[in-house]
């Protein structure tokens, strides 16, 4: 099932979570992710590092697309997030890794709300 939310961020649900526990703004979450450019070129992966990523969601610690999409996932859910440039790294990109205004694709799994 695919859903488009604010910022034209797309959420493609790959496997369900518990459908009960959703993070709220300010919650510390633990996530596994793999980030690619639209052409499939991988730029980062917590899975490859073998270490999940933790952040406070909904408070500007991560890109806007994550702040918008992660609260729509329940614990255990896997999804593919397609995030347009303005909700990713915008016109500055991430030099050496992500071109300016690039649309990014993240395969994410919400492991837990800490």
Swiss-Prot record:
EC number(s) on record? 5.2.1.8
Spell out the reaction equation it catalyses: [protein]-peptidylproline (omega=180) = [protein]-peptidylproline (omega=0)
| This protein's record includes keyword Cytoplasm | yes
Q: One Pfam family of this protein, by short name?
A: FKBP_C
Where in or outside the cell it occurs: the entry states: Cytoplasm
Lineage top rank: taxon: Eukaryota
Role this protein plays: PPIases accelerate the folding of proteins. It catalyzes the cis-trans isomerization of proline imidic peptide bonds in oligopeptides.
Q: Which family does it belong to?
A: Belongs to the FKBP-type PPIase family. FKBP1 subfamily.
The identity of this protein, by name, is FK506-binding protein 1
Species per Swiss-Prot/TrEMBL record: Kluyveromyces lactis (strain ATCC 8585 / CBS 2359 / DSM 70799 / NBRC 1267 / NRRL Y-1140 / WM37)
